[in-house]
Amino acid sequence: MTSRHEQHWLRTYAAETYRGIGAIVDLGCFLGATTISLAEGLALNSRARQQQVHAYDLFTWDERFELWAKGKEVEGCFTVDGSFLPEFLKRTEKWRDCIVVHEEDLTQAQWQDSAIEFLLVDAMKSPETASAILRGFFPYLLPGQSYVAQQDFAHCYTPWIHLIAFRLRDYFSVVADVPGSGTTVF
């Protein structure tokens, strides 16, 4: 559930700024808009042709998504607790070679690969998930080099994100406030 401004920012970042010294990780990729934007940018980045986007989601339709889906092409396509992974795969088919799908519960997920250069977080919907993401992914960030995009930073309904940013203020500074969205990049 992203804006065109966010998608443009992600595409531009992956095409022009991303250096390929660490992974791109998309937490809470939903139906693939952010994953596609990052993959499109990677395709334009000559320094990172072999890189991939690691897309994480539980891919389970939640009752909360019903209101968002109303009036959209996906309205009525999914059942609560059913998988929407096939829809994600259909939408991202064109970029399948540069996307690694991780169908995982982020309260249990643990990054096991190389360093993370870019971490997009659209999954800190509860304090428990936020804590798990901090433990499972943040230790792999490159000091002074990685970017963390917090998709829900501008919203008052996820105050734990602001508390996390405050606690980590000595390690992160604001790089961008993406217009027309709730995303802040550190």
Please annotate each region the language model reported.
Residues M1-W9:
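Conserved SAM-binding loop and adjacent beta-strand
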Residues A15-F186:
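S-adenosylmethionine/decaboxylated-SAM
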Residues L10-A14:
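Pre-Walker A adenine-sensing motif
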